[in-house]
Amino acid sequence: MGLKAKHKENLCSDSQRSKRLYVWIALAIVLSDFTSIFSHWIWGLLILILRTLMDLPTFVMNV
């Protein structure tokens, strides 16, 4: 029973994380449209932030 609850919890956090990812992608597209000169720099920064956000929950769970 405990395992099922934990699995359900993981599914919820995954769906929230994917929603956040879509928001970030939309934001990145808008930003790169407005500032095409800095698009590479913005993409690099966003990818770095996204990777940090993705790794953070797993890091916290491991600790």
Swiss-Prot record:
**rRNA-binding as a keyword?**
no
Q: Which InterPro entries match?
A: Phage_MS2_lysis
Instruction: Please cite one Gene Ontology biological process associated with this protein.
Output: killing of cells of another organism
Query: What are the protein's UniProt keywords?
Result: Cytolysis, Host cell inner membrane, Host cell lysis by virus, Host cell membrane, Host cell outer membrane, Host membrane, Membrane, Transmembrane, Transmembrane helix, Viral release from host cell
Q: Where in the cell is the protein located?
A: Host cell inner membrane; Host cell outer membrane
One GO cellular component this record assigns the protein to is: host cell plasma membrane
Mark the transmembrane ranges. Answer: 21-43
Report how it sits in the membrane.
Single-pass membrane protein
Q: What does this protein do?
A: Induces the formation of specific membrane adhesion sites between the inner and outer membranes, apparently leading to host cell lysis. Lysis may be performed via activation of host murein hydrolases.
Family under the similarity heading:
Belongs to the Leviviricetes lysis protein family.
Q: List the protein's name.
A: Lysis protein
